[in-house]
Amino acid sequence: MAEPSAATQSPSISSSSSGAEPSAPGGGGSPGACPALGTKSCSSSCAVHDLIFWRDVKKTGFVFGTTLIMLLSLAAFSVISVVSYLILALLSVTISFRIYKSVIQAVQKSEEGHPFKAYLDVDITLSSEAFHNYMNAAMVHINRALKLIIRLFLVEDLVDSLKLAVFMWLMTYVGAVFNGITLLILAELLIFSVPIVYEKYKTQIDHYVGIARDQTKSIVEKIQAKLPGIAKKKAE
């Protein structure tokens, strides 16, 4: 009589175990976690996500500080001067360390070899397969950009082309006040500050953005209603 009881219990056990299995991969992650790490593109996008959201303060601080110093240097000096100073600084460090290790080895009469041997032996060659993969990924974005440019300049959609014209008109005023390097500095400050501020005050920001979106949508609809070509297309 023990066998039937075991048989009756086994389906419930198997069903409970089978019900527990799907919950493991589908379990919701933390709110700030980056989704889907299945592919290389997802992992790279998640790395950028973690970088601009200051998940690793040391790593983000290093990237932010280095790029900011580079941009400030380019604002004060020419590109040739900045690149030359960077190469000189790097060579000063490596040559000094090479001489220092050679002197230490001569004094101690040791044969540790080249101090950078581990890095010299690293294989940094780019395979043809990897090159083609990068080129294919780049071509997707290039083709998409070309299609968008053709659409805008050949006025496939009048509203989109007018938006571009207004944006470019505003950029003429921005260009009169700021140069390219200044805009890059401002862009970097925004990239490394806006996401973390948005994450902290998401509810309030979404509320005001929704109001602004509704106002913009109503204005665009009024403009479209006054344009005969677009009104006719909508009626059709």
From Swiss-Prot:
Keywords: Acetylation, Apoptosis, Endoplasmic reticulum, ER-Golgi transport, Golgi apparatus, Membrane, Phosphoprotein, Transmembrane, Transmembrane helix, Transport
Modified residues (Phosphoserine): S30
Region: Disordered, residue numbers: 1-31
PROSITE patterns from the UniProt entry: RETICULON
Biased composition (Low complexity): 1-24
In-chain residues carrying the UniProt-annotated modification N-acetylalanine: A2
Protein's name according to its UniProt entry: Reticulon-3
Source organism phylogeny: Eukaryota, Metazoa, Chordata, Craniata, Vertebrata
